């Protein structure tokens, strides 16, 4: 084997390479037909896909808990949510391999996190912060390459929310402050 540590260093790439090698072997006429080469290759590929799905699930949990913490800052569960953010993010970071970056479905991760947070907040009679952007405002690097600064992540999420018309009453849009005239 050319790179004996690839299995340990990057299971996703290893699985893809092994599946391709098995398919190439399976196409050789001189080899026995007793081995179901295509399905063996598919099973090995599924190892890599499973690892990707695990990281996606952990990222969904990380983001969902961030959204809950942001949307319901006074909820009794806020301390628990903060612990969960740290736990899920660390687990995602430990399992993440660089080859996964292009395979992670970032749009689905963000959408699933928003849906999961919304469902959970309803149980507490809370609602999601309105105006969240369609794309995740937290970069993959922020989520996967270092220990997450939870307060910074919460500020970034809050700053990315686009105020809705009902929220605009708390903002002043006039360039000049209004002055009162007295008679």
Language-model features: where?
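Surface/interface-facing alpha-helical segments and adjacent flexible terminal/loop regions used
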Residues: 1-60, 64-183
């Amino acid at each position: 084997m050319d790179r004996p540590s690839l299995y340990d260093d990057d299971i996703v790439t290893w699985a893809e390479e092994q599946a391709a090698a098995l398919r190439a072997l399976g196409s050789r006429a001189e080899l026995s037909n007793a081995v179901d080469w295509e399905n063996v290759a598919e099973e090995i590929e599924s190892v890599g896909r499973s690892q990707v799905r695990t990281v996606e699930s952990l990222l969904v949990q990380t983001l969902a808990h961030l959204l809950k913490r942001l949307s319901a800052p006074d909820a009794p569960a806020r301390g628990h949510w903060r612990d969960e953010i740290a736990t899920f993010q660390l687990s995602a970071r430990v399992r993440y391999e660089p080859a996964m970056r292009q395979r992670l479905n970032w749009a689905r991760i963000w959408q699933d996190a928003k849906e999961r947070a919304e469902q959970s907040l309803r149980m507490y009679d809370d609602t999601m912060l309105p105006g969240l952007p369609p794309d995740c405002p937290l970069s993959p690097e922020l989520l996967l390459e270092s220990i997450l600064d939870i307060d910074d992540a919460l500020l970034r999420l809050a700053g990315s929310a686009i105020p809705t018309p009902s929220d605009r009453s708390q903002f002043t849009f006039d360039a000049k402050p209004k002055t009162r005239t007295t008679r």
